[in-house]
Swiss-Prot record:
GO molecular function, one term: ATP phosphoribosyltransferase activity
Naturally occurring in which organism (per UniProt): Listeria monocytogenes serotype 4a (strain HCC23)
Location, primary (coarse class): cytoplasm
Catalytic reaction list: 1-(5-phospho-beta-D-ribosyl)-ATP + diphosphate = 5-phospho-alpha-D-ribose 1-diphosphate + ATP
Domain-level remarks: Lacks the C-terminal regulatory region which is replaced by HisZ.
Function: Catalyzes the condensation of ATP and 5-phosphoribose 1-diphosphate to form N'-(5'-phosphoribosyl)-ATP (PR-ATP). Has a crucial role in the pathway because the rate of histidine biosynthesis seems to be controlled primarily by regulation of HisG enzymatic activity.
Localization (cell): Cytoplasm
UniProt-recorded name of the protein: ATP phosphoribosyltransferase
Amino acid sequence: MKALKIALTKGRLEKDAVALLEKAGIDCSSMTDKKRKLIFHSSTQPISFILVKAVDVMTYVKHGVADIGIVGKDVLMEASKSHYEMLDLEIGKCQFCLASTPDFDPSSYRRKIIATKYPTVASKFFREKGEDVEIIKIEGSVEIAPVLGLADAIIDIVETGSTLKENGLLIYEKMYPISARLIVNKASLKQNKTQIFQLIDQLEQAIKEERIE
């Protein structure tokens, strides 16, 4: 049986994803002592794991290097769709928010400048509101953009809001809820349908148990 390759997002989401996979009966013991390794093979199941950055999960899945990926909905919303989104894993929950300094007026008709790591999401949000805005893409700490006068406001993902608060920003609008999703390569789903749907069934059961707990 061909081993399923699962691409996991490195960092905070990785820990939650591994915990959920283990709850679903997936052997993740090879990842216990990671050191600098990025590829891991289960010794008991036909499954291997790849640890990559969030945006690269989609690339590995798109090109079939990984059969399955676990990645935040924020990344999926920003990129073009080249995969099947199969399951909301209900982990890594946060929210897209519009935030700025206390003197920001969201109802102003003046053309606003919005800083964000997510220009596609920001464009969609303001297009739906019928507002014409200028969007500046920021790769680093977007929170300082309105403080330093680069932008009128920001759009970013917010979990607790503590980073915004520490930088003197307020949330003006909560936009789209975000959580981690299971994505599958289109060709892999055809070739490994039984294996993949068995994994999905196991994860769905684990998610149900998490809700009860």
